[in-house]
Amino acid sequence: IVLERGPALDERVKAVEHFSATGELDVNANIQFGEGGAGTFSDGKLTTRIGDELCGFVTEVFLQHGAPEEIAWKQKPHVGTDLLRGVITSIRKEIEALGGEVHFNTALTGFEQKNGRLTGIFTTNGTFACEALVFAVGHSARDTFGMLMDGGLQLECKPFSVGFRAEHLQSEIEKSLYHEAAGHPALPRGEYQLSQHVGERCVYTFCMCPGGQVVASASEEGRVVTNGMSFHARNGKNANAAVVVSVGGKDFADDPRRAIAFQRELEAKAYAAGRSAGEYAAPAENIQSFLEGRGQLNIGRVQPTYDRG
């Protein structure tokens, strides 16, 4: 049995498109919540550093459900949000055909235990008898984290990264990588990965999206969150990447609630900073201005792709 707090894919896509067009957020149907999770609206990267033998199995499953054959041999395979949606739906249908159940629009609200053992769970759509429960809630289900801690479960602070999205012309990335060969059809879209140690911390780029766009990824009202997304062709004019720094338990006295409060505070400040430009508009400035602390934005050759302005 799989419980998903958000809707099935078709309904979810409509909700995301509605939010993009109007700024009206559905807190349970968005770029974080719904069938496929946050990965549905992403670059669809299949790269990992863990080297587990199950990685090959995952690739085979993706291929069986419609992913492009190139993911089996490319050094940096990716599916793209457009093709990934069909793969996700196909996997879910096979689970159902084999006797599994997927309950959409069903959020976990509580649990019951007896003699230290789990006996059942409470949801927005009823109660389920349950002896084994796997949480795969991502990092945005903060209400679920709070419910678990209120119920007596001990949660630990996991390191996470915080930062912003940087956009630049894809053509300039490729010129810097390929020089005079830039634009040759045999070459893949240019990618990069940067890192720099600053004191005890490391600043680095993450989830670089060649030819992609920046999307509004809020799942709580009054907060701005950004993410990067690419289609399979990666043929957009801009590239984008997250520029982030890691924070961990010691930054929050090993208190998960303080870590969550920190995230919410930053997201609320971003919402307030962009509010004058519209609902869920994001604050922006030129990178050079950011580095110099000037807070200025002059839009030139790079046109921001963030869909809420």
Which residues does each predicted region cover?
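Residues forming the flavin
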Residues: 1-309
